């Protein structure tokens, strides 16, 4: 399979090949048969770029559904060293309705946490301030999943949502999680962890002040659990601020 996939990738710029329905069918079957393992494979990166391109430029729902099921199983086998970013961003946006049932089942399953670990930074916010692909589509699928699986989905979603809307307030997603599931300690812990995952260059004091401003804005939240959590976060940030100021002065 790998030598054949290598041949296809070497000719990936010959888009006219995929205009032949028979060739296109063979290529897609080859993609679905491609072995994804823990072993580093030099083809993995090019494979991911090629598959992403096919998904973006095509409209084959059956292929997208089959690919989603394949990746759920393959990504769950162990930590993958290959870079497969790009594929799931397209799947959860363009083919959302097609893949959702299988995706949702895997997302909330403890047996498929390896799969979630592999994709969460790509389709979530990761270490950036942006909005991940999972949250770029304006529908109720993620919210409904959280309500359907309140013991599993919210704490996982909380790790992936965008934290800030602007320089002064938390994002709508962040506020929704607090409003709906702020009575769950696991969810609050996940939100706390999410606030601490940013990649930041230079002094972190501006980031700490940004967090403090957002937290001060929800000190009077209707949930007592959230109010207590806010106080805990503020105390922690104030300690971080003092430590950082002392370090910079030194």
Go through the PLM ranges and name each one:
Residues 1-250:
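Non-catalytic all-alpha helical scaffold/repeat segments
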